[in-house]
């Protein structure tokens, strides 16, 4: 919280590259533009809304052009509108930057729309790594129960045991 937003996003570039100050500034400004964050460079985190903080976090994550970006519940704390904006931003930045996103989320409908592949982790075991369409048609009881929540709690012991025995 003691660094400006500019310095926060610039930090990995300064620490991991030999870029000149002008190059660092240009990269940070490019990221601010990509994230629709005009005029935030001189502000501090406490001065930003939750959605702006999420976009700053994405800007910093993309500062070094990573091949893979991990997101853990990336829309937690956002309203539906801001959550949708974040998912659109993920899609836009993936197309522009070309990274692979690994997203941990309980927002299943959004994940099905956004993802090329979906995996369910239950009791430390990946139950399936499938396309969203295959995932929704899966006969695996745990996946089926996860997709169709009308069947009851996801960890009913008989179904869980049966599913885990199938994968063993």
Model-predicted segments: where are they?
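H-loop/switch region of ABC-family ATPase nucleotide-binding domains
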Residues: 105-106
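Conserved ABC ATPase "signature" region
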Residues: 22-39
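A short, proline-enriched helix->beta-strand linker immediately N-terminal to the Walker B motif
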Residues: 63-67
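Conserved ABC ATPase signature
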Residues: 44-48, 52
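A short, surface-exposed alpha-helical micro-motif characterized by mixed small hydrophobic
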Residues: 111-113
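Catalytic Walker B motif of ABC-type/P-loop ATPase nucleotide-binding domains
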Residues: 69-72
């Amino acid at each position: 919280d003691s660094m400006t937003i500019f310095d926060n996003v610039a930090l990995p570039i300064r620490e991991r590259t030999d870029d000149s100050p002008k190059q660092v500034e240009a990269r940070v400004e490019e990221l601010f533009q990509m994230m629709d964050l005009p005029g935030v460079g001189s502000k501090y985190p406490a001065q930003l809304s939750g959605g702006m903080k999420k976009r700053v976090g994405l800007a910093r994550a993309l500062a070094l052009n990573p091949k893979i970006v991990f997101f853990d519940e990336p829309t937690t704390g956002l309203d539906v509108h801001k959550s949708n904006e974040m998912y659109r931003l993920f899609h836009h930045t993936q197309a522009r930057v070309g990274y692979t996103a690994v997203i941990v989320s309980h927002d299943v409908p959004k994940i099905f729309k956004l993802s090329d592949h979906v995996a369910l982790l239950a009791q430390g075991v990946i139950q399936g790594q499938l396309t969203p369409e295959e995932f929704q048609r899966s006969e695996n009881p745990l996946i089926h129960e996860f997709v169709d929540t009308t069947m009851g709690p996801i960890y009913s012991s008989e179904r869980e045991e049966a599913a885990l025995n199938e994968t063993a």
